[in-house]
Amino acid sequence: MESTKKQVSLELLPWLVVHTDGTVERLAGTEVCPPGLDPITGVFSKDIIIEPKTGLSARIYRPFSIQPGQKIPLMLYFHGGAFLISSTSFPSYHTSLNKIVNQANVIAVSVNYRLAPEHPLPTAYEDSWTALKNIQAINEPWINDYADLDSLFLVGDSAGANISHHLAFRAKQSDQTLKIKGIGMIHPYFWGTQPIGAEIKDEARKQMVDGWWEFVCPSEKGSDDPWINPFADGSPDLGGLGCERVMITVAEKDILNERGKMYYERLVKSEWKGKVEIMETKEKDHVFHIFEPDCDEAMEMVRCLALFINQVEA
């Protein structure tokens, strides 16, 4: 009797496997939870459609404490997952957004961009750009009634931080009347062919991350593609970053740690006229705040992000 078990064509661990018939089986980030009232923070959320043609959706959040007529900052959030996994309804992200919205007192729009390999890059960037440029046109009451569009922030973790970086450039170069107040980049997913920092000693992990990127964005440039390496040939000069303020957070044990620090250093030395700050969390690894939301370090990071958005010195 012939086995009905699917044969594996490609393993991209720990995220997914691709079977010989072309189907993609994700191994992480597939759990979902509904929107609604969060009993712990009092934050309300609901799912909305941004672009009916593509099915692009988002989960929007508003704090409990908001008053009629009150205007508060608007935060577009982009989740991580190496452009391969996760969603706005992934329980850990939903919990994280509830905490950020409660602490920072913002209207948040968590963008559910489409994932590779079914939707190869630059689809994630295009979806995120669609969400940003159409944020007013969708005619969402929570945005119309409560969001201060002059206080617009782009925030993301890992791949989502990478997206925030690119959107800040695109918004400045476009003819859209978009003014981004600041971007928050949590453990940004930047990479490069030449290893630096911990990448030099941890060859196995370096090769693994190389493989992730080559899978979602196959090109002759590899990890020196401007999408992933902001300092590679063809990347826009950081002096042209289209926002007033930047906050970068890195984690000591994260393989991406040195990339985030390098971004900070290069931005400081550039012609950019804004204000940048960096925060390093000791003894923690990549996106720890998503998987340990109640640890002291995660709560401190959320507190500092809230201060950044509300222009208060930590």
Swiss-Prot record:
Catalytic residues, chain numbering: S158, D254, H286
Molecular function via GO: carboxylesterase activity
Enzyme class: hydrolase
Alphabetized Pfam families for the sequence: Abhydrolase_3 (PF07859)
Keyword terms, alphabetized: Hydrolase, Serine esterase
Source organism, top-level taxon: Eukaryota
Reaction catalysed by this enzyme: a carboxylic ester + H2O = an alcohol + a carboxylate + H(+)
EC number: 3.1.1.1
Family annotation (InterPro entries): AB_hydrolase_3, AB_hydrolase_fold, Carboxylest/Gibb_receptor, Lipase_GDXG_HIS_AS
Tissue expression summary: Expressed in roots and flowers.
Locus of motif Involved in the stabilization of the negatively charged intermediate by the formation of the oxyanion hole: 79-81
Family: Belongs to the 'GDXG' lipolytic enzyme family.
Role of this protein: Carboxylesterase acting on esters with varying acyl chain length.
PANTHER family: ARYLACETAMIDE DEACETYLASE (PTHR23024), CARBOXYLESTERASE 2-RELATED (PTHR23024:SF577)
Protein name: Probable carboxylesterase 2
This protein's encoding gene: CXE2
